[in-house]
């Protein structure tokens, strides 16, 4: 389907053809993200960034993406700083903000709330995370990252094996990425989590119904060997209600240098949507992997700007012929940053 003027609420909206078009658009925009050229295709357009839940990367990434295309951004963060704290309904907020902006990016702690907001207006709304629901733009940048890493390694997404580790129950990035990968052929999914944090049964059923191999494990020793991708995610402590337990989540689920050396291959890519929890007892992706050549988490985060530029360009129908809006970049530019960190790791 065409993304022009559409809400982006779920990966369910995408076909494999849509992914290919997004990939091509993002490739065109890489020089803009890398500050090699400038682009003003959205000069005069306004994006409203509505974040009712904590965010660093996603909020700033969307803001940067729109600004690098020449657009302007208006922001609000948290309920405290919005009229919702005064009793305004989500419906009223939607109608008012739609009068200000050409596109709206929204994050909300309640599943389904972004879709409810979008149903009230005709301005395109992009879901930046709705509780334990979905995070479609994260899945799209994860796909873009996997594609880039596999191009380097001369691998195909079709037939790959991915291990998803951590809080699979509450981690919306897992839900969206698994749905996206199910559009490909013969994917081998390995879900690694304790009983209390297992992936939703309906997600596993969907993947199996599309002909994919789905296995569940309760430790990394059995789940990691032979994987092409390790996708770790933190425990969503903010979504675990009082009285609920993380029973069984321990060091045996932690992805660290020792585990990677023992169970992974030299070509296994290590991913994480970030933030990772560095506190004691969190058992999140270890910092002892920070200099590992196959650690892609920062390339992954950098790709967010590129992919979100592509989303804006396609939704606002400026993606075709966008190169005509490129102009030379002016000012200081670092020798290496963003996607260029592959040079630092001496990756070819």
UniProtKB/Swiss-Prot annotation:
Carbamoyl phosphate binds at residues 57-58, 107, 135, 138, 274-275. It catalyses: carbamoyl phosphate + L-aspartate = N-carbamoyl-L-aspartate + phosphate + H(+). Keywords: Pyrimidine biosynthesis, Transferase. It is an enzyme of class 2 (transferase). SUPFAM superfamilies: Aspartate/ornithine carbamoyltransferase. Pathway: Pyrimidine metabolism; UMP biosynthesis via de novo pathway; (S)-dihydroorotate from bicarbonate: step 2/3. InterPro entries: Asp/Orn_carbamoyltranf_P-bd, Asp/Orn_carbamoylTrfase, Asp/Orn_carbamoylTrfase_sf, Asp_carbamoyltransf, Asp_carbamoyltransf_Asp/Orn-bd. One of its GO terms (biological process) is 'de novo' pyrimidine nucleobase biosynthetic process. GO terms for molecular function: amino acid binding; aspartate carbamoyltransferase activity. Belongs to the aspartate/ornithine carbamoyltransferase superfamily. ATCase family. Heterododecamer (2C3:3R2) of six catalytic PyrB chains organized as two trimers (C3), and six regulatory PyrI chains organized as three dimers (R2). NCBIfam families: asp_carb_tr, PRK00856.1. This is Aspartate carbamoyltransferase catalytic subunit. The lineage of its organism: Bacteria, Pseudomonadati, Pseudomonadota, Gammaproteobacteria, Cardiobacteriales.
């Amino acid at each position: 389907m065409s993304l022009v003027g559409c809400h982006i609420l779920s990966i369910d909206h995408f076909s494999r053809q849509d992914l290919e078009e997004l990939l091509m658009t993002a490739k065109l925009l890489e020089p803009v993200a890398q500050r090699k050229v400038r682009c003003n295709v959205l000069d005069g357009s306004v994006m409203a960034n509505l974040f009712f839940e904590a965010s660093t990367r996603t909020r700033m990434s969307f803001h940067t993406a729109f600004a690098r295309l020449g657009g302007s951004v208006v922001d609000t963060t948290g309920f405290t700083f919005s009229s919702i704290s005064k009793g305004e309904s989500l419906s009223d907020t939607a109608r008012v903000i739609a009068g200000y902006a050409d596109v709206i990016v929204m994050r909300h702690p309640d599943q389904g709330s972004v879709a409810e907001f979008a149903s009230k207006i005709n301005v395109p709304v992009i879901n930046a995370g709705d509780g334990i629901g979905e995070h479609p733009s994260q899945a799209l940048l994860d796909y873009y990252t996997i594609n880039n890493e596999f191009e380097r390694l001369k691998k195909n997404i079709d037939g790959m094996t991915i291990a998803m580790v951590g809080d699979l129950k509450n981690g919306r990035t897992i839900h969206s990425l698994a749905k996206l990968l199910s559009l490909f052929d013969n994917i081998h999914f390995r879900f690694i989590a304790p009983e209390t944090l297992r992936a939703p049964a309906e997600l596993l059923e969907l993947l199996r119904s599309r002909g994919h191999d789905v296995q569940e494990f309760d430790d990394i020793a059995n789940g990691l060997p032979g994987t092409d991708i390790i996708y770790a995610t933190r425990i969503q402590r903010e979504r675990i209600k009082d009285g609920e337990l993380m029973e069984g989540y321990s060091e045996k689920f932690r992805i660290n240098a020792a585990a990677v050396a023992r169970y992974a291959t030299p070509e296994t890519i290590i991913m994480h949507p970030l933030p990772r929890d560095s506190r004691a007892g969190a058992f999140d992706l270890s910092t002892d992997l920070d200099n590992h050549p196959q650690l892609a988490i920062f390339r992954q985060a950098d790709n967010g700007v590129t992919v979100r530029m592509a989303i804006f360009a396609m939704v606002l129908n400026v993606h075709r012929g966008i190169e005509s809006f490129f102009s030379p970049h002016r000012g200081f530019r670092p020798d290496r940053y963003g996607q260029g960190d592959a040079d630092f790791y001496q990756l070819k």
